[in-house]
Amino acid sequence: MRRAALWLWLCALALSLQPALPQIVATNLPPEDQDGSGDDSDNFSGSGAGALQDITLSQQTPSTWKDTQLLTAIPTSPEPTGLEATAASTSTLPAGEGPKEGEAVVLPEVEPGLTAREQEATPRPRETTQLPTTHLASTTTATTAQEPATSHPHRDMQPGHHETSTPAGPSQADLHTPHTEDGGPSATERAAEDGASSQLPAAEGSGEQDFTFETSGENTAVVAVEPDRRNQSPVDQGATGASQGLLDRKEVLGGVIAGGLVGLIFAVCLVGFMLYRMKKKDEGSYSLEEPKQANGGAYQKPTKQEEFYA
């Protein structure tokens, strides 16, 4: 359990301090089987480390200034931890890249603490500690070869090494490369071969300008055509809408006129019927009264009263 806790602690340090502590990353990687499977590729990277070291020794002064600037800007991004002081002390070593042998010496100094703890826990881990030390020796060369391959090819204008280093490096190295690439363009512009570097940005800038001009021209052309289409389309739509509106209005007017005429006719008929009814009623009143008088004549008292005397 204690050993697993130590492995987890080392992995956490590796993830939190990737750009600042490549040595700790190297010590954390060998226990994992991934670096063990890549020992063969580490040998190739170790063979190429010598050539990279010769190139970097020829240009130590610009690389140290740029590395110190990058390292001072990068440690601020990770979370504040108690090991930042050690990160600052160890970050100066990869800046020069000359004291890589000293870095290899620092690794065994850190490991003996772990080996001592393991020896206190169990006597057998001595054999297991010897095996990781051999792997660490190989992985240190691998990491030192990968780091310059990722950082310096940008400064020395060697794209070949950069292409081989980016896929070969693990996920942690890939996370570390963006910081170096961010500072890479400034380093290449200030490094040697200013003519090549000036041609590249000039071509890129001209291409970008061409793209921007083309897009702006297309946009202006589209904008110039769209207003015409928009101006023409409303006229067509207005004409069609006006014709449709007139047709609709004619129909509406026809319907209104027909309705008005029907209403007038109905009103006239109603008024005539009412007048006829009134007249009929007047005439009917006399006709009705006459039969009443005839019927009532039998019952009516005689107008002439004849008095009969007995």
UniProtKB/Swiss-Prot annotation:
| Transmembrane parts of this sequence | 255-275
Residue spans of biased composition, Basic and acidic residues class: 117-127, 153-164
- Pinpoint the site Cleavage: 242-243
A GO cellular component entry from the record: cell surface
The main location class comes to: membrane
The residue ranges for the Cytoplasmic side of the membrane come to 276-310
Family annotation (InterPro entries): Neurexin-like, Syndecan, Syndecan/Neurexin_dom, Syndecan_CS
Task: State the residue spans of region: Disordered.
Answer: 27-100, 114-212, 284-310
Which positions carry Phosphoserine?
285
* Tissues/organs with expression: Detected in placenta (at protein level). Detected in fibroblasts (at protein level).
Q: Which GO terms describe its biological process?
A: canonical Wnt signaling pathway; cell migration; myoblast development; positive regulation of exosomal secretion; positive regulation of extracellular exosome assembly; receptor-mediated endocytosis; striated muscle cell development
Record note on modification: Shedding is enhanced by a number of factors such as heparanase, thrombin or EGF. Also by stress and wound healing. PMA-mediated shedding is inhibited by TIMP3.
SMART domains with a match to the protein in the record: 4.1m
Q: Does the keyword Lipoprotein apply?
A: no
Q: Which UniProt keywords apply?
A: Glycoprotein, Heparan sulfate, Membrane, Phosphoprotein, Proteoglycan, Secreted, Signal, Transmembrane, Transmembrane helix
Annotated GO MF terms: cargo receptor activity; identical protein binding
Q: Provide ranges: composition bias, Acidic residues.
A: 32-42
Subcellular locations according to the entry: Membrane; Secreted; Secreted, Extracellular exosome
- Identify the residue ranges that face the Extracellular compartment according to the record: 23-254
Q: What does this protein do?
A: Cell surface proteoglycan that contains both heparan sulfate and chondroitin sulfate and that links the cytoskeleton to the interstitial matrix. Regulates exosome biogenesis in concert with SDCBP and PDCD6IP. Able to induce its own expression in dental mesenchymal cells and also in the neighboring dental epithelial cells via an MSX1-mediated pathway.
Q: What do we know about how this protein assembles, alone or with others?
A: Interacts with CDCP1. Interacts (via C-terminus) with TIAM1 (via PDZ domain). Interacts with MDK.
The similarity annotation says: Belongs to the syndecan proteoglycan family.
Which PANTHER family did the record assign?
Answer: SYNDECAN (PTHR10915), SYNDECAN-1 (PTHR10915:SF5)
Q: What is this protein called?
A: Syndecan-1
